[in-house]
From Swiss-Prot:
UDP-N-acetyl-alpha-D-muramoyl-L-alanyl-D-glutamate binds at residues 42, 160-161, 187, 195. It catalyses: UDP-N-acetyl-alpha-D-muramoyl-L-alanyl-D-glutamate + L-lysine + ATP = UDP-N-acetyl-alpha-D-muramoyl-L-alanyl-gamma-D-glutamyl-L-lysine + ADP + phosphate + H(+). Keywords: ATP-binding, Cell cycle, Cell division, Cell shape, Cell wall biogenesis/degradation, Cytoplasm, Ligase, Nucleotide-binding, Peptidoglycan synthesis. This is UDP-N-acetylmuramoyl-L-alanyl-D-glutamate--L-lysine ligase. It comes from Streptococcus suis (strain 05ZYH33). The keyword Ligase applies. Signal peptide: none annotated.
């Protein structure tokens, strides 16, 4: 429950209030109204809902339908002149976050908050942290892959970082469930559209940075992308940063006055010895660790999570056990065919993560290697060039381009945009399942491998804005073992 008086106080304190408009009347105050729900979905309103009219695709007709359902008040940057009072603000997204925070009783104050950002590795690092903290704490987790608000029941996530109304509702539920910690992935988009506006994290972790999410509906430039990634550092009480990341000196300077730990090359916290399924660390986490996820980058993610959890009350024993227990759906999952050939399923979906995936596989598989790859439609358009240029560096790999969440674009046209930057041959098979079957049928020995990149554990394809039925890469591959 929240009163309109409190709503207006919050907006005015944030310098985000313009006025209240109803017909020809303009006001700066209002009294005697209470709201028992918040919503940005015009299909889920009641007379006591405070509704937020947001988004480029929002239409006046949505508001009119909500009024038919009894809506009596809304917040907007625009006066839609629909006959009910409108609280006009400068920034609707800022308003949503601060009002949701208040409506749910500031649940963040009752949780220790850990956030991961980076171009890749956020989900893996979040899972490491979850498994570490669950040894002696009660963590909830919001990840790109799955969400748990009670530490036991998992459900599929819709966004890397939820909309602020959903985020604070989830936090409140986690508190109600007795959780003590919350692990989150915080995307650059979350800061771009202010889903975490006003929120301070106890520990923020910056894993890495490389060009991604650059396009008409995301970030216009790499500089803008990097800036929004770095905002997590400004909004965290303590930070963990990868000393081996590109542009590290920029971040190092930014966090110099904060409580911080660095890990990786040139830092105290390094991996001194590394094998496929174990590694040895120096510094605060000094010791030997078993790990299920192969690849040096996964070992670095484990170190980042361990350092963060150490600051949040985990013991070294918790960290050892949690790292050893961690596996992640759709991340470096390995199947073995009857002929001994390996199938690697991974969520790698940008140039840098695909390169690391290929390099790890080539360390272990010396025979014929197939790569199944696509690029999503209507987002991350810079990936297409990145993929094309990257694949030129691996002429020994057989490449099959295919559909990967084409959305409202033609998968064949996306493949041609990738090919435009390639100086080598590749095949195109529209149907993703057929592409997987074809590649697996052409392997013949334990030295061979099929790499299926992009979708990980996603059991759908995004086509024309909807989630179309698809079994998922891992399940499809299992059918042809």
């Amino acid at each position: 429950m929240i009163t309109i008086e409190r709503v207006l106080e919050i907006l005015k304190a944030d310098a985000n209030f313009r006025h209240i408009k109803q017909n020809d009347q303009t006001d700066s105050t209002w009294t005697d109204v209470q709201f028992d729900a918040l919503s940005y979905d015009s299909r889920t309103v009641s007379p006591m809902t405070l509704f937020f009219a947001k988004g480029l695709a929002f239409k006046k007709e949505f508001l009119e339908k909500a009024i038919e359902a009894g809506l009596a008040f809304y917040v907007s940057e625009i006066n839609y002149e629909v006959g009910i009072p409108a609280i006009i603000v400068h920034d609707i997204k800022q308003a949503m976050s601060l009002i949701a925070m208040e409506f749910h009783g500031h649940p963040q104050k009752q949780l220790k908050l850990l956030a991961f950002t980076g171009t890749k590795g956020k989900t893996t690092a979040a899972y490491f942290a979850f498994n570490i903290l669950k040894q002696s704490k009660k963590p909830a987790m919001l990840s790109t892959m799955n969400t748990t608000l009670d530490g036991k029941t998992f459900f599929k996530s819709t966004l890397t970082t939820p909309e602020s109304l959903d985020l604070f509702a989830m936090m409140a539920e986690a508190v109600k469930n007795g959780m003590t910690h919350l692990i989150m992935e915080v995307s650059s988009q979350a800061y771009l559209v202010k889903r975490v506006y006003g929120l301070t994290f106890d520990v923020g972790v910056f894993l890495n940075i490389s060009p991604d999410h650059i396009g008409p509906i995301e970030h216009p430039t790499f500089e803008d992308y990097f800036y929004h990634k770095r905002l997590l550092m400004d909004n965290s009480r303590a930070v963990i940063v990868n000393a081996g990341m590109d542009h590290f000196e920029v971040v190092k300077e930014q966090v110099s006055s904060k409580d911080h730990d660095f890990y990786g090359p040139t830092s105290e916290n390094q991996i001194s010895q590394s094998a496929g399924f174990d590694f040895t660390a120096t510094g605060k986490l000094a010791g030997h660790y078993d790990i299920q996820l192969i690849g040096g980058f996964n070992q670095e993610n484990a170190i980042a999570a361990g350092l963060a959890c150490l600051r949040l009350g985990a013991s070294l024993e918790d960290i050892h056990t949690g790292i050893a227990q961690t596996n992640v759906p759709g991340r470096m999952e390995v199947l073995t065919q009857q002929n001994g050939a390996k199938v690697f399923v991974d969520y790698a979906h940008n140039g840098d993560s695909v390169k690391k995936l290929i390099d790890v596989v080539l360390e272990h598989q010396t025979g014929k290697v197939f790569l199944i790859l696509g690029a999503p439609g209507n987002k991350g358009e810079s990936r297409r060039k990145d993929f094309g240029l990257l694949l030129n560096d691996y002429p020994q790999i057989e490449v099959i381009l295919t559909a990967d969440d084409p959305n409202r674009e033609d998968p064949a046209a996306i493949a041609e945009q990738i090919r435009a930057h390639m100086t080598r041959t590749s095949n195109f098979i529209l149907d993703r399942e057929e592409a997987i079957r074809t590649a697996m049928s052409q392997t013949s020995s334990p030295k061979d491998a099929v790499i299926i990149a992009g979708k990980g554990a996603d059991a759908y394809q995004i086509v024309n804005g909807e989630k179309a039925a698809y079994d998922g890469d891992l399940e499809v591959a299992k059918q042809y073992l």
